Every structure is written in C-alpha cells, then in structure tokens.
A protein has these predicted regions:
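Long, contiguous C-terminal flanking segments immediately downstream of a protein's structured core
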Residues: 41-42, 54, 286-392
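Bacterial N-terminal signal peptides
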Residues: 12-25
Length: 392
C-alpha cells in the first residue's frame, strides 16, 4: 500500500495536507477544498475531477474498444484515467471528455500520449482535470471550419495542465464562457496556415475568456491571429454565479499572466474583449519572430458589434483592462511596456478602459529572459522530458 501511495504521489494524484494560496470571492466550500493537484492555480485550482472515484486503466492505443481512452471516458461515474501505454492514439472521430473525470496523462510511460486527427472536446463536460496530453489535430483525416485541436464553452470547473495543442484548422485551443477555469503550463502553437478553411488562410490561436478564468504560464507561438482573442461578454452567457454578479459583464473576469507570445505573424495577434468584462494582462513576455509585423503590439481593445457576435444589450461595450509588468523585446524600453503597446478602438481611450481587478492569487514571476527560457522548456506535455521539441 505504501508503495502504491508513493507512486500516486509521484503522479500528483493525491493532495498534500498543506495550506494553499490566498482566496478571494470564494464560496465556503471552495475555501475548505484542497487544490486539484500540487501546483494547481487560478480559478480552476479547486476542481475535483475524478477524485474519490474509480481508477480506469488505458491498456492500448486503439481508437475505441475495451482498454482504449474512448472506452475509458465512456465509463459511468467519477473516475481517474491512467495509462499503461504510451504513443499515438489515431482518433477516428471527435473525442468527448466526460464529466467528473481526471485524465492523468503523466502516468503514461515513455514520452506520453498524443491524440491525432480529431478534436478533444469539452462541450459536454463539467468538473474535469486533464494533464500531460498532446493534441495534434491536422487536416489529414477531416477538414471542417470548426476543427480546433481542443475547445469547450458553457461548462464549469475545468483545469488543463502541461498539455500541448497544435495543428488546427480553426483555432488551436478555444475556451470561453466557462465558469471556474484554468489553463496553465500549456503549449498553444502552430495553427495551420491554409488547411482548407472556407475563409482561406487562417492560423488562429484561440478565443479565451470566462466567468472567472485563468490563463497563466502558457506558451503561444507561430500563429497569425487570435494570440489570443479575448471573448468578452459578447454572447451574454448566463452560467455565472448570480449571488456574486448582477450580469454577465460583471461576471466576465479573465486573468492572463506569465504567458510567452512568440512570432504572432502579420495578423491581429492579441485583441478582443468586446461586450465588456474585466481582463488582467500581467507579466507576460512578447518576442516578435520572423513573421511578426507589429513587433511591439500587446493587445487591441475591441468593442461589441454585429460583426463579432455582440448581442443587443452590449453594442459598443469594451472590457476594462489591468495591464502591468509586461515585457516586449522589440520595444526601445521593453520592461513594463504596457499601455504603450495597446491599440485602441477609435471611440475609446486608455483612460476609459483602465482598471485594477483583484483575482485569486497565483504564483507570479517577473518576465525576464530567464523566464522565457524556462517557459519554453517547462510547458511540455511529457512528464519524462522538459524539452519543447519532445512535446510533439
């Protein structure tokens, strides 16, 4: 039993009895819960996933059938999925994540698990932990305009950790209008440039947002557009805690920090926030690459209108931003290059959208060259190696 417990602890599947980081606007239940796993941070840090349920083993790399990952996800009840094998799982259709589930990719031997050819979908799942999984969507088996490597919206209680997503037809990884969400230490890279989308050349990173959503310590690279695009409250999703907020604008709260953006191409890069809401952009690192046109861009403030899904209550609304501590390598004074790198819509000024937003405490690092290097090496989807190139 002690040997089993040691093994589980090495995978991060048990929770140490430690005091955790400070809380803000948390319910009594959240305040007394343990983190999802050691190192879980942000708004999704108290997700339980499969804790307390059965353990299901993935014993082969087949798309379906007994012992496959799809079979494991189809099992009823609360569950933690572990892997006895490693390698490529060649999907034959979209893979739906089930509720009350932990997918513990770090348990796979060798170089871990890679999902290929179809989307990892969170549209039917609440209370989910996914760690150390790679998704390589591509256009090899299927081309459609909604083909993300992974995505989910209108859900609650999700945390993604040390995953790697790439090769999408639409966005690489889109998560917005979710309640209590974290994406941390993930790679979001290499959206396909012209894979057959009906709009032509694409290469989009993702739409990010949520009603208490954290995106921290992620690496975004080699994409033309939506790096990321902040969703804002433009869809007026009502799945927020109505005891805390009066409307979806108040509830739209996004913390975006300690991320590294590289080579965001000649498209829009980072932009968004239409329909209102609150966005923190703190201690991020921007490094222009050979394909980058606007090399000192931090973000662009967008307003809600008919062209971006704005609903009638919110036309002309923009989010309020707290922008601080960002590092832009191409700027003449790169440190704290914050509002200097913000492009404003013509009807707004920085004074109109500046804000200070308290959010749950997470580990905060200064954006230095050493941070960029550590990010590129650490945000890997294989627990056996920290090299980004091995995350393919």
């Amino acid at each position: 039993m002690e040997m089993k417990n040691k093994l589980l602890r090495s995978w991060g599947l048990t929770i140490p009895m430690t005091l955790f980081l400070g809380v803000f606007n948390l319910s009594p239940i959240q305040a007394q819960d343990a983190p999802a796993f050691p190192g879980a941070e942000g708004h999704g840090r108290y997700v339980k996933g499969g804790r307390g349920g059965k353990v299901i083993h993935v014993t082969n790399l087949n798309d379906s059938g007994t012992g496959s990952l799809r079979w494991a996800l189809s099992q009823s009840g609360t569950k933690t999925i572990v892997f006895d094998v490693s390698g490529y799982i060649d999907l034959k259709s979209q893979l739906n994540v089930s509720s009350n589930t932990t997918i513990a990719g770090q348990t796979a031997p060798g170089d871990g698990i890679t999902l290929r050819y179809y989307t990892l979908y969170f549209g039917k799942s609440d209370n989910v932990i996914v760690r150390f999984i790679r998704c390589r969507r591509s256009q090899v088996k299927d081309v459609n305009d909604g083909a993300d490597a992974t995505w989910g919206r209108n859900r609650k209680n999700i945390i993604l950790d040390h995953c790697s997503f790439s090769w999408s037809i639409d966005e690489v990884a889109s998560f917005y209008d979710n309640l209590n969400f974290t994406m941390q230490w993930c790679n979001v890279t290499e959206a396909l440039a012209n894979p057959g989308h009906s709009k032509g050349a694409h290469s989009f990173g993702g739409i990010w947002g949520g009603k208490n959503a954290s995106f921290h310590h992620n690496f975004l690279a080699h994409m033309q557009n939506r790096v990321p695009r902040f969703n804002g409250a433009r869809y007026n999703w009502d799945g927020y805690d109505k005891t805390l907020y009066e409307n979806s604008i108040q509830a739209e709260r996004v913390d975006f920090r300690n991320c590294v953006m590289y080579n965001w191409g000649n498209g829009n890069g980072c932009y968004g926030g239409p329909g209102g809401g609150y966005i923190n952009m703190i201690n991020n690192y921007y490094k222009a690459g050979p394909g980058t046109s606007n090399k000192t861009r931090v973000t662009q403030v967008s307003v809600s209108d008919a062209s971006n899904g704005g609903k009638n209550p919110f036309p002309g609304y923009a989010s309020r931003y707290y922008i601080n501590g960002n590092y832009v390598t191409a700027a003449s004074s790169p440190k704290n290059y914050d509002w200097q790198g913000v492009i404003m819509t013509p009807v707004y000024t920085p004074l109109m959208v500046k804000n200070t937003l308290p959010i749950p405490i997470i580990t905060t690092e200064k954006t230095k060259h050493t941070r960029r290097t550590q990010m590129a090496l650490t945000a890997s989807a294989s627990s056996s190696t920290n090299q980004l190139t091995r995350a393919r």
